[in-house]
């Protein structure tokens, strides 16, 4: 259901419903937001309606406004139960059904943002042809095992105002007589139909040219769908020039052979073993890397200590050499120091001789280029300000880009639709298998029951003939009748047990539905609204009493 909620939110934002970016699901809709969005949709469907745009603060006005919205939804064709409680004390399932119906009724030009005359590239044209082929395959396909309710559940528009005659979300009796799995299967089918109907309304998806006509009726989705060359080309394009996928029929035939299944199992086991070995090797590699880093750090510490010891050794060796003949060595050092001092004085005089003209030249250049330096300083300040402005603009654009990136692309919707179709096919196969097993079991039960009844009749007739003359036959007849009675009671108990289990499952389904209705939250909200109405009633009574008192005083005067 998250995908449907995303599509609903995207469609509401396309018609300028002013939804916050923090809204990520229908469960976050407050009554005020719900009233505003539903009113916007109804005004787009029928501009002649006079509907309020906001929810007033008073409880009496709230009941009036929500009741008017419920009547407007019924007037445009909504067939399910709807009233003020749908807006004030709603649950996600009811809100989703209402929005699905309203979005289906929206005029086409209110949600289609793509230019129908825009040129199509080669890939878009290929996708359009694929979607046309899928639509033709899905139209008019019926399966003998499909319930008649589902065969006749169509989505159509009547009249010139693009209103649904009986939309698929309003069929209240479609799931009558079916179990929990049938209802889930039907729910998945309706989700897929809703995906196909809403795909062309996405402004950034490019489905405007895909050919999903809203005025064309769509039959129940069923049966096998063949894979044509266009689908293979599209898959190859999205796989970035990878190897072409073989035909779906060859894959199914190859998958059904026992040898190929055995080979696949062996390959999967080998892959699992290789993955285990790879993970073990990676773990060992990480351990060795950690050990290598530890050893390298230790070696580096030892090398640094060795370097320090070498320096100390050199100093001590020189000191030892000097201490062997101290007077001569001290005289040599003093002569070296005196020579170094003389050399330093000579270099200082040479430096002063070169420094004076250089300083004069530097001062001359500074005086000459002071204006250029000041201009460069001002320009650098302007560049810094411009950089700050552009950095803020870049941050804002990055936020907008991230917000725009939440929109799901056309490829994601296409793959999701194909995935839902595959799930429907799989669920249909499971349901057909269950129905076949149930019918086979029922036939077997009926056959065995008939055989037992016939055998009892024959045995009863044979024993009853001899019961008058033979005492043992009489006792056998009594035991036979008792056995037949007890077996009948056991059969009745088994049937009652099945009935009780079925009722238990139905009650569990009802409990799940009640949990989805947010009964506790709605009761708390109703209690708050009741207290608010009581406070308003007391304020009105006090105002009436004050008016009566003022009127009585004026009368006495």
From Swiss-Prot:
Gene Ontology MF annotations: cullin family protein binding
Signal peptide residue numbers: none
Coiled coil regions, renumbered to chain: 260-350, 489-554
GO biological process terms, semicolon-separated: positive regulation of ubiquitin-dependent protein catabolic process
Keyword Ribonucleoprotein belongs to the record: no
Name under which the protein is recorded: Coiled-coil domain-containing protein 22 homolog
Key word tRNA processing present: no
Sorted UniProt keywords: Coiled coil
The family this protein is said to belong to: Belongs to the CCDC22 family.
């Amino acid at each position: 259901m998250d995908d449907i909620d995303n599509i609903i939110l995207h469609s509401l934002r396309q018609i300028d419903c002013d939804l916050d970016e923090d809204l990520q699901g229908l469960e976050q809709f407050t009554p005020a937001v719900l009233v505003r969005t539903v009113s916007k949709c109804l005004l787009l469907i029928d501009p002649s309606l006079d509907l309020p745009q906001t929810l007033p603060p008073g409880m009496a006005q709230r009941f009036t406004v929500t009741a008017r919205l419920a009547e407007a939804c019924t007037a445009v064709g909504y067939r399910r139960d709807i009233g003020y409680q749908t807006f004030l004390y709603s649950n996600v399932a009811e809100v989703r059904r209402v929005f699905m119906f309203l979005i289906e009724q929206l005029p086409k030009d209110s949600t289609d943002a793509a230019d129908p005359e825009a040129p199509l590239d080669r890939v878009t044209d290929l996708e359009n042809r694929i979607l046309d082929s899928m639509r033709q395959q899905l139209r008019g396909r019926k399966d003998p095992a499909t319930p008649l309710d589902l065969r006749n559940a169509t989505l159509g528009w009547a009249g010139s105002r693009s209103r649904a005659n009986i939309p698929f979300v309003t069929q209240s009796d479609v799931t009558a007589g079916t179990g929990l799995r049938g209802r889930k299967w039907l729910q998945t089918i309706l989700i897929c139909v809703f995906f196909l109907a809403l795909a062309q309304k996405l402004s950034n998806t490019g489905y405007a040219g895909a050919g999903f006509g809203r005025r064309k009726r769509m039959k129940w989705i069923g049966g096998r769908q063949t894979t044509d060359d266009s689908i293979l080309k599209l898959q190859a394009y999205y796989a970035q020039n990878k190897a072409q996928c073989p035909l779906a029929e060859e894959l199914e035939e190859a998958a059904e052979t026992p040898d190929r299944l055995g080979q696949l199992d062996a390959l999967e086991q080998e892959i699992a073993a290789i993955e285990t070995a790879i993970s073990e090797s990676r773990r060992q590699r990480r351990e060795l890397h950690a050990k290598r880093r530890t050893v390298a750090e230790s070696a580096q510490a030892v090398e640094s200590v060795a370097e320090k010891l070498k320096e100390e050794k050199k100093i001590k060796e020189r000191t030892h050499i000097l201490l062997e003949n101290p007077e001569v060595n001290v005289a040599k050092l003093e002569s070296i120091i005196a020579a170094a001092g003389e050399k330093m004085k000579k270099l200082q005089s040479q430096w002063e001789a070169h420094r004076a003209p250089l300083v004069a030249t530097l001062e001359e250049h500074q005086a000459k280029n002071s204006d250029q330096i000041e201009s460069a300083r001002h320009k650098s300040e302007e560049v810094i300000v411009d950089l700050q402005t552009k950095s803020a603009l870049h941050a804002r654009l990055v936020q907008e880009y991230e917000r725009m990136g939440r929109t799901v692309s056309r490829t994601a919707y296409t793959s999701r639709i194909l995935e839902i179709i595959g799930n429907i096919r799989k669920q249909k196969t499971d349901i057909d298998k269950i129905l076949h097993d149930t019918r086979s079991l029922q036939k077997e039960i009926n056959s065995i029951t008939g055989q037992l009844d016939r055998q009892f009749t024959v045995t009863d007739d044979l024993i009853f003939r001899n019961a008058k003359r033979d005492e043992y036959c009489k006792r056998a007849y009594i035991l036979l009748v008792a056995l037949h009675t007890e077996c009948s009671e056991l059969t009745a108990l088994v049937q009652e047990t099945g009935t009780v289990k079925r009722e238990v499952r139905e009650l569990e389904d009802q409990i799940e539905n009640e949990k989805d209705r947010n009964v506790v939250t709605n009761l708390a909200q109703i209690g708050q609204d009741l207290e608010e109405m009581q406070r308003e009633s007391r304020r009105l009574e006090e105002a009436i009493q004050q008016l009566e008192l003022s009127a009585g005083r004026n009368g006495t005067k």
